[in-house]
Amino acid sequence: MVVRRSSRQGPGGNIVDPGTNPHPQGGDALPPSPILMRMKGDSLLAPFGMLGRSALDTAAQIGRWGGLASDTIRAIPRVGIWGRLLLGQMARIGVDSVPIALFIATFTGVVMALQASYTFTGAVPLYFVGTLVGKTMVLELGPVLTGLALSGRVGANIAAELGTMRVTEQIDALETLAYDPVAYLVVPRILAGILMFPIVVILATSVGVAAGWLTSLQLLDMSTAEFMKGLRLFFEPWDVQFAIIKSLSFGLTVTSIGCFFGFTTEGGAEGVGISTTRAVVVSSMVILVLDAFWAATLL
């Protein structure tokens, strides 16, 4: 038996198959697919989901860092574990960092003197070069540039060293032997950073000011008396105390963040590289935030 499909006439006299809609537009249009609508909604909400996950991850990291900080404070009385390691860490974190800090401070002082001379030409007495070099190096550039440089050197070194110990299960071995890994690995590094960062900053700042003075003598036709006049003009002892406070906080920041990312490393060699990068980036960001915080609260 043959089934004959009937056809009907659409607009304009055209023959239209009965399975099709002769009016594809207008009120008879098919509703949008729920799947497509869901996909479109998901694409619009995706940035908010990523933001939420990032916020949760950040909060979790801060919580884990707080746990390590609490363990570190409880481990400080165990001097018998970390006491003999402190001097070695002070040498690695402080003494070995002096060359790069002095190198940065030297050229910073030279540039500051030249830029101050260029800015003050014909408008301000030239001895204000000493004022600008001294104030800027002591209050800002000395501590901050040194802190950023040491975050790359010290923070990366700590994160890489502890991260390697974590992925090779050396830290787990210390726990198995009833050794407190926090007292053995974290406390001496953090205390060394707190003690040595101010010393390195003072040396770097002094060299930066001296470099500005020599630049003024050789290139700006200034005398030592003129430079010293400007240097003493607005100098206050509080400036040095302010720089020391900042450097103390920078030392704590760089070493504690390096220890945290090293201790939480996972994923083998790739994880060590990721932890090292994160330690440098996060400590540099926190240094800049602390710089603004101390300026807003203490100046």
Name every feature range the model reports, one short phrase each.
Residues 91-145:
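Active-site cofactor/substrate anionic-group-binding motifs, chiefly glycine-
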Residues 94, 98, 102, 141, ...:
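Selective transmembrane-helix segments that form parts of the transport pathway or gating/packing helices
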Residues 162-187, 269-272:
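Short cytoplasmic-facing helical segments at TM-TM junctions of multi-pass membrane proteins
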